[in-house]
Amino acid sequence: MKIEKNTVASLAYQLTIEDGVVVDQSTVDAPLDYLHGHNNLITGLERELEGKVAGDKFTVTIAPEDAYGEHNEDLVQRVPADVFQGVDELEVGMRFLADTDQGPIPVEITEVDGDEVVVDGNHMLAGQSLTFTVEVVAVRAATEDEIAHGHIHQAGGCGHDHDHDHDHEGGCCGGEGHGHDHHGHGKKEGGCCGGGGCGSH
């Protein structure tokens, strides 16, 4: 079976960024599963997977415009530290959900300067070319429920879980890893495929 819309593919992959650092991976024994054709992957990778079959192996470099976009300086802002209510000590690397006119977006603290904090709303891989080494482990037809919900229904795959205490903003895949932000929602903004799900951007 070929990878096409409404199929579920299982992938073993390694993701490296421009300096050669490995930022995410999954193995043949614990592959990443995702529903194809439902925006569960970054555009460039999903396009490369179209038509592949189990056993296919390839390496591809995805440009920023087909991954997480270029780094947008408009998403870097200096804000008063007191907007972070209920946090005893602000530190570089902390992540939060910020309420915006476009809805909540994840931001990361990149600088703490006295009573002011610099936050960055860019994805951590924005502006990066991403190189994937991929093996297609398996391909199957999606179930009706999976197609209706737009994601797979098994542990370890890409998509949303249904407990709404979590926010998903993963790397390549939706983000099934859960860190903690300070608004009561777990989130991961990981590499391409956070904790078992390669995902939407």
UniProtKB/Swiss-Prot annotation:
EC number per UniProt: 5.2.1.8
Alphabetized InterPro entries for the sequence: PPIase_dom_sf, PPIase_FKBP_dom, SlpA/SlyD-like_ins_sf
Subcellular location(s) of the protein: Cytoplasm
Annotated catalysed reactions: [protein]-peptidylproline (omega=180) = [protein]-peptidylproline (omega=0)
Region annotated PPIase first part, chain positions: 1-69
Chief location: cytoplasm
Residue ranges constituting the PPIase FKBP-type domain according to the UniProt record: 6-95
Region (PPIase second part): 129-151
IF-chaperone: annotated segments: 76-120
Keywords: Chaperone, Cytoplasm, Isomerase, Metal-binding, Nickel, Rotamase
Single GO cellular component term: cytosol
Family affiliation: Belongs to the FKBP-type PPIase family.
Role: Folding helper with both chaperone and peptidyl-prolyl cis-trans isomerase (PPIase) activities. Chaperone activity prevents aggregation of unfolded or partially folded proteins and promotes their correct folding. PPIases catalyze the cis-trans isomerization of Xaa-Pro bonds of peptides, which accelerates slow steps of protein folding and thus shortens the lifetime of intermediates. Both strategies lower the concentration of intermediates and increase the productivity and yield of the folding reaction. Also involved in hydrogenase metallocenter assembly, probably by participating in the nickel insertion step. This function in hydrogenase biosynthesis requires chaperone activity and the presence of the metal-binding domain, but not PPIase activity.
Protein name, UniProt field: FKBP-type peptidyl-prolyl cis-trans isomerase SlyD
Organism in which the protein naturally occurs: Vibrio cholerae serotype O1 (strain ATCC 39315 / El Tor Inaba N16961)
